[in-house]
UniProtKB/Swiss-Prot annotation:
GO cellular component: membrane
The keyword DNA-binding belongs to this UniProt entry's keyword annotation: no
Modified residues (N-acetylalanine): 2
Membrane topology according to the record: Multi-pass membrane protein
Membrane-crossing segments per the record: 15-35, 61-81, 95-115
InterPro entries: TMEM254
Subcellular location: Membrane
Keywords: Acetylation, Membrane, Transmembrane, Transmembrane helix
Protein name: Transmembrane protein 254
PANTHER family reported in the protein's UniProt record: TRANSMEMBRANE PROTEIN 254
Tree of life domain: Eukaryota
Length: 123
């Protein structure tokens, strides 16, 4: 049986990775939905590369965008299953894991995967 602390276990992920993921997904969203508003010439080497992708592979970018969100949904659902398997029974903790994994994907899920619940010794 899980301890009370284990049943409510939640750990926020790394601010570094959350920032990287947020900026990357934000840029990806901008590229997919508003490519005409991107100042390609001001982005250094990223500008011409992004413009090439938009001009020649926009359908692939769109499909990849929705696939990335679909993967995040799958990771989030797996996080719920993993919570139950690891003895995290608190609805609030499970919701936090679901949301964090939905928005930040593998950066969150790896924390949950690494979690080892402490087993109580039977006397």
């Amino acid at each position: 049986m899980a301890t009370a602390a284990g049943a409510t276990y939640f750990q926020r992920g790394s601010l570094f990775w959350f920032t990287v993921i947020t900026l990357s997904f934000g840029y990806y969203t901008w590229v997919v939905f508003w490519p005409q508003s991107i100042p390609y010439q001001n982005l250094g080497p990223l500008g011409p590369f992004t413009q090439y992708l938009v001009d020649h592979h926009h359908t692939l970018l769109c499909n990849g965008y929705w696939l990335a969100w679909l993967i995040h949904v799958g990771e989030s659902l797996y996080a719920i299953v993993l919570c139950k398997h690891k003895g995290i029974t608190s609805g609030r903790a499970q919701l936090l894991w679901f949301l964090q994994t939905f928005f930040f994907g593998i950066a969150s899920l790896t924390i949950l995967i690494a979690y080892k619940r402490k087993r109580q010794k039977q006397t």
